[in-house]
Structures are given as C-alpha cells and as structure tokens.
Amino acid sequence: MAKKSTEKTELDFENTLQQLEAIVTRLESGELPLESALEEFERGIKLAHLGQERLQQAEQRIQILLQKSDSAKLSDYQAEE
C-alpha cells in the first residue's frame, strides 16, 4: 500500500504521460504475452486516472488564481465534436 502513495507523490504529470505513452506503445506492438499485456493495461488505467487528477488539480489552481485577479476571466472549455 505504501507504493501507491509514494507513486502518486513521485510522478508529476509529464512523467505520468511519458509512462502512459510507453505502455501504449508496448501494447500496440502486440508482442506482449496476454498476462503481461493485462498488467500493462491495468497500470495504464491507473496512470490515466493519475493524469486526470493532476489536470484537475492544475485547473483548480488556475481558477483560484484567476478568481483572485479581476483582470482575467476564465471561460469554460468547449470541446469540438
């Protein structure tokens, strides 16, 4: 269990993304045995969630900073479909 908390504090967004991209590359190669592919996939899901948490934290920090400053307004992001 200590590994999870240590992992969360050690990985910043860039490292999380880099590891996730490496996992995707290995999975897309099709050369991993099934059990290894499942383990990599599970790790990738955890990294994706961690990356989402990091992005949400950054967005919250930006919103707080902009609320403190009347000179800039934050508008909601509209994804193109």
UniProtKB/Swiss-Prot annotation:
Principal location class: cytoplasm
A Pfam family recorded for this sequence: Exonuc_VII_S
GO CC annotations on file: cytosol; exodeoxyribonuclease VII complex
Bilayer-crossing regions: none
Gene Ontology BP, a term: DNA catabolic process
EC number: 3.1.11.6
Presence of keyword Nuclease: yes
A GO term, aspect molecular function: exodeoxyribonuclease VII activity
SS bond list: none
Compartment list: Cytoplasm
Catalytic activities: Exonucleolytic cleavage in either 5'- to 3'- or 3'- to 5'-direction to yield nucleoside 5'-phosphates
SUPFAM superfamilies, per database record: XseB-like
Protein keywords: Cytoplasm, Exonuclease, Hydrolase, Nuclease
Top-level EC class as recorded in UniProt: hydrolase
Keyword Hydrolase: yes
NCBIfam families for this protein: PRK00977.1-1, PRK00977.1-4, xseB
Similarity comment: Belongs to the XseB family.
HAMAP family xref list: Exonuc_7_S
Function comment: Bidirectionally degrades single-stranded DNA into large acid-insoluble oligonucleotides, which are then degraded further into small acid-soluble oligonucleotides.
Quaternary context: Heterooligomer composed of large and small subunits.
Name of the protein described by the UniProt record: Exodeoxyribonuclease 7 small subunit
Organism: Pasteurella multocida (strain Pm70)
Species classification: Bacteria, Pseudomonadati, Pseudomonadota, Gammaproteobacteria, Pasteurellales
